[in-house]
Amino acid sequence: MERRLLLVFALTFVVILLFQPLLKKYLPQPPAPKPEAAQPQSPQALPDQAPLPSAAKVVSGTPVAGKKVAAAPSNKQAETEAETVIENDLYKITFSNRGGRVKSWILKKYKDKPNGQPLDLVNSAAAGKYGYPLTLWTYDEGLRNKLNSALYVTASTGTSAPAEISFDYSDGELAVHKSYKFDHSYIVEVHASVEVNGAPVSAFPMWPSGFGDETTASAYAAGQIAYQYDANVERLAMKKISGGGTVPGPFQWAGVSDQYFAAVIIPGNSQSAALVTLRNQIEIPHKPSDKNDKQLDKVDVLGIAVGSLKGPTAVRMYVGPKTLESLQSVQVPGITGAEPDLRGIVDFGWLGLIARPLFLWLKWTFKYVHNWGWAIVIQTIIINLALLPLRLSQMKSMLKMQRVAPQIKAIQEKYKKYSLRDPKKAEMNEEISALYKKEGVNPIGGCLPLLIQMPFLFAYYRMLGVAIDLRHATWLWVPDLSAPDPIYILPIAIVITMFLMQRMTPQAGMDPAQQKMMNFMMPAMLGYISFNLASGLCLYWAMGQLIGIVQQWSLNQSSLGREMREMMEKRARKKEK
């Protein structure tokens, strides 16, 4: 029974690992909206909130109530395209006065690959089609295109933080002002105002085209859009994300992120804020590392635009890694509870109650060993030692079940002649239950340890999937604990240790042919799965099984283990006769 249950859990693990990629690949996806065909969408008012102005009214330049329409602005345009660089210890940003946009956003402390170059967060392939960071979104596509292609007049106070840079444009009808303020953190203060014939028009700063570390289909699949109001974080499912769909406020922050990096916008006025969700498609090489591979994959690129529906926009913008320390340093007014900051953008999943403490514990261990691989090894040893009583309980439960197995078989033979619908079958179950109670047998006692151990494995899988600290972290021969083992030593170790565990663990009551099949099928199946898993997870898995082998060997030498072995040999001899 235990082996069948283990198979069920293993198959469940397969489903969890493969569900999201299969969903994206095989289920029909809504067509990506074409920029040239986008239609203005009206934000919907939330309950207990006054109706918001329609997109058409906002775009048409309706003056803000109580304000006079200003005179037409004088011309202010640059003659040629030029670039300006702003940097601090964390990033180096290159602006172009063409649209007042960001051409590159380089994070100095992160690499594009192990021992590679500093990572550029601008996804150039997607940005070339759907827009660069810090361009402006308006509900009028024609106006939007003009805003993001005009040549702005640039002014800056310097190239090193603290610094400010501004972009201005006017042509007698349209007047645009954008300014950015930088300090020594990942936060940028953004101000934007657009007027058409003196009437304010809503224009939202954008992060429209994913991130520069996205090079594979799985990396794009990890993208998500989320926002937080009060203590509640809402994560939008892919099917709810459209090109230009509006989520009206109030909310304290809204962000787009991938596995390791995020762009989060904090509106100055949460009540009048609105979030525009962006989703487009591009084609990328199926195997980016293989220059001869001509196969292309279609992937979804996510983005956001956040601003005020009532005149000029003032926001703070966090662009950087999804480290808990960096996100915690950004205080957000209006959020209640224990975390009034941006840590909600990190999604530990439905096992977050286990995954997050595991990660904090892993970080604490890292402070003392200074290597993430050895921190995983130490944590795995402690977890398995803590679960040792469960292994002992499982063996005791199996032994008790085998002791009463002949009596259970006799009861089943007694009622064998009755059909399943016969009331007598109920009496059989009552007799078996009475026998269990008399002998102190818990029929699910052998399953309980598995039920407790599996969430730890799933939580570890989820935790390592969002822990940027393990990105490009090395251990012995492994160059990146967040990526698969390049020479497959860890997956092979999983196969070998699983096979040994199968051989050493008592398999009472199982048919020899079935036992032989399981001894080979389970290691082969789990080994196949592990070939594409992160090395950090494979290390945890293989190390856990290695410790399990030592524990199982010790249990097999105990009186309990000897009794179990003798009972199995006795039953095997009876079957041979």
Model-predicted segments: where are they?
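Helix-loop-helix
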Residues: M1-P43, F95, H191-E195, W207, ...
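Juxtamembrane extramembrane loops of integral membrane proteins
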Residues: L23-A125, F167, D171, R571-K577
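Soluble non-transmembrane domains of integral membrane proteins
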Residues: E83-P340
